[in-house]
Design a protein with these regions (language model features):
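A sequence-level/structural motif corresponding to short, flexible coil/turn segments enriched
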Residues: 1-277, 284-299, 303
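Short beta-strand segments within Ig-like beta-sandwich modules, predominantly Fibronectin type-III
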Residues: 303-309
Length: 309
């Protein structure tokens, strides 16, 4: 949603005459198999404020859209043969990466920055399943890759896997069998990764259908998985007394994990009135309460402090 409860919608199209009314960066089809698209419409869904295509000469698709508190727009998608097309004003990038994140201006008239990530082989590595921009503008991605599953859909068996994706030191799981989930946090200016890890079983074809996972605003992902296919039980479970630590199916079984990426959040916003020689200066706390256990600390600079909400 936009600042005024307006709506952003994204997707993909193979139509060379897909309508893109209003303001927007790209007004013509980029060529190739598909282009991504993004629409900004009013809250009643009867006026298009702006719209843009997002694509070049191969396969391009937008999966998710998020906005921040300034109304800036972030999209996550896949791209084949991306080369350096999606790299602009971003220190962290992978030329020819199979996934891209773009930060648009509010009116979709241009990019603030854009980057591609992945192995850099010119094909998509993961299917995105969840996307978040948190209150501090950190960018969260969840997705899965599996050559074995994608081969069943007719793709070559040597593409669309998780091997070779960047992970960070001390991450939860640093190795992959190429058929796992991938969790990532990117810095708000695309200068680097704050955290990245694999999660999945070894020698298992872990995957999921779309629309089955979410991040909350604190960066916790709730992810459903088609796990432990082949009647194994190697997908990690926790704690030991969880509902079902083993796979009780004779093939795949549904698994749900809640993973806290544990990035510290300092959330603050203030309203300070203008004045001169005020005897009393009221402070109004406009911080967004993301948890009932949130703590507040005021330091007035004169030795006085407060924990009032």
């Amino acid at each position: 949603f936009g600042l005024d409860s307006s709506i952003y919608v994204v997707g993909g199209t193979a139509s060379t005459d897909f309508p893109v009314p209003g303001l927007g960066l790209q007004k013509t089809y980029g060529g190739g198999l598909t282009d991504g698209w993004i629409y900004h419409i009013n809250s009643d869904a009867n006026v298009v404020y702006s719209s843009s295509l997002e694509g070049f000469n191969a396969y391009d698709q937008i999966y998710f859209v998020e906005t921040n508190r300034k109304g800036e727009v972030f999209v996550l998608g896949q791209a084949d043969n991306s080369q350096s097309n999606y790299i602009q004003n971003a220190t962290y990038n992978k030329p020819n990466g199979g996934q891209f994140i773009t930060k648009f201006k509010t009116d979709l008239s241009g990019w603030i920055w854009s980057t591609s990530f992945g192995r850099g082989t010119g094909v998509s590595d993961i299917s995105p399943t969840a996307f978040l921009v948190d209150l501090c503008n950190s960018i969260y991605v969840s997705g899965w890759g599996s050559p074995s599953v994608n081969a069943e859909a007719g793709w070559p068996s040597n593409v669309h896997g998780t091997s070779g994706l960047d992970v960070t030191p001390g991450c939860y799981q640093s190795t992959t069998d190429n058929n796992d989930f991938y969790l990532m946090i990117m810095r708000d200016d695309a200068s680097g990764l704050q955290y990245a890890t694999y999660i999945g079983g070894i020698n298992e074809v872990d995957h999921v259908d779309g629309g089955t996972s979410r991040f909350d605003k604190k960066g916790v992902v709730y992810q459903s998985v088609c796990a432990s296919c082949g009647a194994s039980s190697r997908f990690p479970t926790y704690p030991a007394n969880c509902v079902s630590p083993t796979n009780r199916s004779n093939n795949c079984n549904n698994l749900l994990f809640k993973f806290d990426l544990d990035i510290p959040l300092t959330i603050a916003d203030f309203s300070v009135p203008k004045g001169c020689n005020l005897n009393q200066l009221p402070f109004t706390n406009l911080s967004k309460r993301v948890s009932a256990n949130a703590n507040y600390y005021w330091d007035f600079g004169d030795g006085n402090t407060s924990n009032a909400a």
